[in-house]
Amino acid sequence: MRFKITLSYNGAPFCGWQIQPHAPSVQQSLNDALSTLLREDIAVVGAGRTDTGVNAIDYVAHFDYDKSIDTAALKYKLNAILPPSIAIKNIEETDNDFHARFSARRREYIYHIHREKDPFAEQFSYQYSYPELDFDAMN
């Protein structure tokens, strides 16, 4: 059976989504947590890669497992053992031909840029003061 996971994460403590040697990744954290809870090696497939420090909202991944799962209980347990920077929002059984990467219908990228120093925004945005940005040219 195939299971679809929707999650969000703060990418600050990670080298990105994809497993990298000698660096913490979101994928490795999820693999480890699922493998612990389901008591067998689980390999999660993600919708795509994110770079070091990049955050994700409603990121989709999938994994295969041969037994039936109480998805609500698994969500609760995953959120209890994963680092605080990763939040599982939903787990559901899906069709076996669903693929987190190849079944995606769209991806959306949001860039937060602020013009003045703001201690509350610095972790999740980029401060850019000069010169004036040309947003039309950026599109």
What function would you assign to each model-found segment?
Residues M1-N139:
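Structured-RNA-binding interfaces characteristic of tRNA pseudouridine synthases
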